[in-house]
Every structure is written in structure tokens, then in C-alpha cells.
Amino acid sequence: MAKKSLIQREKKRQKLEQKYHLIRQSLKKKIRSKVSPLSLSEKTKIREQLQSLPRNSAPTRLHRRCFLTGRPRANYRDFGLSGHVLREMVYECLLPGATRSSW
């Protein structure tokens, strides 16, 4: 199981990303807009505003974790579980529709 502090840190990042998502998106849209081209100085001002946002509010800082164990690796997006937890739950028939493979 992952350390509690790492799980809490990831939750904090998710909250920050949700809080600043619209602001970040609008600033990026302004920079990329081809309808009204911006001068170089205007673009740098917008970039400075982007850089002034908290680092942890960037979506690239987020990492998927297993919601049961908090494990950061080998996660299946469909279930939100890590591989070994998924395997155990399938063996115990706790996931409807998921079956063990046999050939």
C-alpha cells in the first residue's frame, strides 16, 4: 500500500487542477488564437500569467492511482484498480462481467 502522504498529495493536485482548469485553458486559447494574432509582447504577458499559476495545477502533474491501494503503477483505466488487485477481485468474482482467461 502506498504512503498516505503520497495519496493525499495526489488528491491535492487533483483539486488544484480542477480549480485552475478553466483559467489555464482560456490563457492557452488566447495564445493559440489565429483569429486575432497577438504581438510578441502580449504573448509573453500571457505566458507569464500561465507560469504564475501553481505548478501542481498542470494536468501533466497528475498520476493515476489505484483507489484501493494507492499504487501508482499498472493501473487499468476501466476499473481504476492496479493489476494485482484487479486479478484478486476477478478471482473472487467481485467484478461483474470480468472473467478469468482460459484457453
Swiss-Prot record:
Record's keyword terms, sorted: Chloroplast, Plastid, Ribonucleoprotein, Ribosomal protein, RNA-binding, rRNA-binding
An annotated GO BP: translation
Molecular function via GO: rRNA binding; structural constituent of ribosome
Pfam families: Ribosomal_S14 (PF00253)
Keyword Mitochondrion found: no
Places the protein is found: Plastid, Chloroplast
Family, per entry: Belongs to the universal ribosomal protein uS14 family.
UniProt protein name: Small ribosomal subunit protein uS14c
Taxonomic source organism: Agrostis stolonifera (Creeping bentgrass)
